[in-house]
Amino acid sequence: MLEKTTRMNYLFDFYQSLLTQKQRSYMSLYYLDDLSLGEIAEEFDVSRQAVYDNIKRTEAMLEEYEEKLMLLHKFQARQQLVAELKQLINEEEHVNDKMKQVVEDIEKLD
């Protein structure tokens, strides 16, 4: 469950601008603010089922966006490469300072 929540938080972060205001609100309250379906339903004066359906549809949309655009995948790949570069730099005693700067610049991109 925690893995799914983390993934949805990342996907929401990358693709929220592609969602409607209602979808953003529901996802933000559910995943970021940790409100229950009932609490969200009460706030928007709709049924719990309506909130559930909207969140499930939005989750599917986010997964579809990721399948096509792969922003999360690319982000994770960059993070992995930066971690490997850092490890190599730390293992090598006389690494060029320029290489260290390049790694720092790559990290700033995210």
From Swiss-Prot:
Q: Which domain of life is it from?
A: Bacteria
**Cross-referenced InterPro entries, in alphabetical order?**
RNA_pol_sigma_r3/r4-like, UPF0122, UPF0122_fam_protein, WH-like_DNA-bd_sf
Q: Which residues form a coiled coil?
A: none
Pfam families annotated for this entry? UPF0122
Annotated function: Might take part in the signal recognition particle (SRP) pathway. This is inferred from the conservation of its genetic proximity to ftsY/ffh. May be a regulatory protein.
UniProt lists the family membership as follows: Belongs to the UPF0122 family.
Name of this chain's protein = UPF0122 protein Bcer98_2498
